[in-house]
């Protein structure tokens, strides 16, 4: 009885403080009269109602997260998937709910990338800015300003000393990531929207792709364009360099993927099977070779494909995996309900991850050529994703203007 009365008195004091501090004087007088309260409110009750409400919201959020994790565990138990205790890092995949949902951009997030060394990530946006975040704490670090139109792509060099960005303002910028975080070089040369950038692994050259249908190679030290690759008949959407820097791949609105030798202007292969614009490409790591060969039905001892292997995602809603040497499409992954906007191979080599305009991230089992998990990631189109090479994290960006961090387990 006493405890109940004490709780009621404290609640009344907290409500009275809230009414008084927000200027609801008439309501406060009526409440005091109704509750038979003294005129003075003890100081310890200041802001108590709001604190209680915040605590309730925080607890509700925690309950929802725990329910999502419990649901995930139950689903795995029913489907017979490996439990957390039995999974090794090569099997870790992103699981709901997201660890962080980061807000700050004022328009569509176009690209998200991890820093190769530090616990940082960068996001580019149509609001013409680049934002830097700490992916382990979810803290906002800084904003890089300099572009005057939508920032389309980002790329760190292999040591993380430089960040390259490209924009609809026709420029490419290099940003110092050792000390100042300032723009140290701006390069001009494309005649239209610059849609993609990618460093050659050694870090001395940078490649860029544009709506002007060309790919350009730039010397990082001088900022001079040293080569221009021509061949695509429409907007070049993305360019990516393979692990040893000898080959680069590009994809285009002309429905094709082209593979080029970086030390010449020669087009090594033109890969044509997509039925719409090819939005994204990703080189397969060596760790994925066994899974890709098994999926392709090749005998690993006798008729195995040697690679290198390349994946491409398209507006035709499919992902295709190619043997670059033979030019063959080895298999196709079908499951997305809208454009495929981003793809990345799992470092362990067993899986591929994709982002799509159907608002999902999907995890694909390469050996079995099937979607093994779907994350309903964003409230609008998913535009980009990245997976860290050594830490258990995936990041995604969206038209909903948020960046999400997903923990792998």
UniProtKB/Swiss-Prot annotation:
Coiled-coil blocks: 54-81
Role played: Positively regulates the activity of the minus-end directed microtubule motor protein dynein. May enhance dynein-mediated microtubule sliding by targeting dynein to the microtubule plus end. Required for several dynein- and microtubule-dependent processes.
Domain notes: Dimerization mediated by the LisH domain may be required to activate dynein.
SUPFAM superfamilies attached to this UniProt entry: Lissencephaly-1 protein (Lis-1, PAF-AH alpha) N-terminal domain, WD40 repeat-like
GO biological process: cell division; establishment of mitotic spindle orientation; microtubule sliding
UniProt record similarity statement: Belongs to the WD repeat LIS1/nudF family.
Protein keywords: Cell cycle, Cell division, Coiled coil, Cytoplasm, Cytoskeleton, Microtubule, Mitosis, Repeat, Transport, WD repeat
One Gene Ontology term, aspect cellular component: microtubule
Lineage start: Eukaryota, Metazoa, Ecdysozoa, Arthropoda, Hexapoda
InterPro entries, per database record: Dynein_regulator_LIS1, G-protein_beta_WD-40_rep, LIS1_N, LisH, PAC1-like_LisH-like_dom, WD40/YVTN_repeat-like_dom_sf, WD40_repeat_CS, WD40_repeat_dom_sf
Protein name: Lissencephaly-1 homolog
Keyword Transport: yes
Membrane-spanning ranges: none
Organism of origin: Aedes aegypti
Gene3D superfamilies, A to Z: 1.20.960.30, YVTN repeat-like/Quinoprotein amine dehydrogenase (2.130.10.10)
Record has Metal-binding as a keyword: no
Annotated LisH domain residues: 7-39
Ranges for the WD repeats: 104-145, 146-185, 189-228, 231-270, 273-332, 335-374, 377-409
Superkingdom of source: Eukaryota
Chief localization: cytoplasm
């Amino acid at each position: 009885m006493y405890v109940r009365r004490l709780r009621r008195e404290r609640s009344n004091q907290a409500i009275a403080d809230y009414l008084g501090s927000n200027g609801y004087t008439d309501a406060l007088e009526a409440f005091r009269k109704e509750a038979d309260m003294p005129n003075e409110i003890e100081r310890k009750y200041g802001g108590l109602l709001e604190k209680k409400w915040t605590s309730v919201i925080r607890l509700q959020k925690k309950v929802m997260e725990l329910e999502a994790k419990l649901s995930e565990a139950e689903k795995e138990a029913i489907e017979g998937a490996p439990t957390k205790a039995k999974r090794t890092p090569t099997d870790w995949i992103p699981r709901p709910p997201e660890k962080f949902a980061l807000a700050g951009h004022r328009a569509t997030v176009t690209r998200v990338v991890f820093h190769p060394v530090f616990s940082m990530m960068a996001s580019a946006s149509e609001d013409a800015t680049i934002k830097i975040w700490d992916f382990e704490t979810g803290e906002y670090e800084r904003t890089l300003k300099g572009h005057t139109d939508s920032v389309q792509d980002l790329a760190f060099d292999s040591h993380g000393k430089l960040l390259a960005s490209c924009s609809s303002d026709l420029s490419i910028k290099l940003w110092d990531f050792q000390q100042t975080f300032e723009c140290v070089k701006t390069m001009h040369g494309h005649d239209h929207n610059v849609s993609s950038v990618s460093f050659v692994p050694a870090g001395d050259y940078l490649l860029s792709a544009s709506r002007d249908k060309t790919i350009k190679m730039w010397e990082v030290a001088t900022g001079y364009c040293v080569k221009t690759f021509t061949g695509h008949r429409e907007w070049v959407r993305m360019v990516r360099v393979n692990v040893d820097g000898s080959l680069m791949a590009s994809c285009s609105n002309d429905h094709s993927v082209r593979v080029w030798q970086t030390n010449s202007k020669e087009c090594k292969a033109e890969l044509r099977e997509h039925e719409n614009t090819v939005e994204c490409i990703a080189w397969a790591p060596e760790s994925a070779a066994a899974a890709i060969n098994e999926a392709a039905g090749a005998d690993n001892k006798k008729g195995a494909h040697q690679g290198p292997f390349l994946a491409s995602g398209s507006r035709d809603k499919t992902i295709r995996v190619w043997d670059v040497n033979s030019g063959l499409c080895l298999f196709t992954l079908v499951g997305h309900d809208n454009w495929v906007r981003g793809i990345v191979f799992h470092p362990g080599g067993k899986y591929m991850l994709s982002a799509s305009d159907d608002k999902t991230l999907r995890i694909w089992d390469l050996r079995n050529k099937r979607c093994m998990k779907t994350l309903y990631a964003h409230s609008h189109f998913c535009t980009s994703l990245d997976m860290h090479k050594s830490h258990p994290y995936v990041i995604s960006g969206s038209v909903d203007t948020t960046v999400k961090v997903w923990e792998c387990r």
